[in-house]
From Swiss-Prot:
HAMAP family: DNA_YbaB_EbfC (MF_00274). This is Nucleoid-associated protein slr1847. Pfam families: YbaB_DNA_bd. Homodimer.
Amino acid sequence: MAQGKGFGFGLGKIKELQEAFQKAQQVQEGAKVLQEELERMEIPGKSADGLVTVLMSGNQEPLSIEIDPSALEKGAEGLSASVTEAMKAAYAESTETMRSKMEELTSGLNLPGM
């Protein structure tokens, strides 16, 4: 190997590598905190008629379903439609919340592809 020639890892590259590791560690620590935060969230979703409310965690885990007694008058098909609407609404809100929180976590880190 010629004098002064290395493996292409000059001081600048080592500094970049250290910064990349630090960013990865920040994201890992932040992701753990975020995961715990999302687990504690209770995100509601309602049916269009307002008779069914679904609570879902920030991790899209269904937590509970509240059904107004008058929803039973809609019959099985109508009730099923209301529950499905409420589930979809809660899921959409939960995934949007998760996406938004992930953006907050990674903003300013200049991560490729994020």
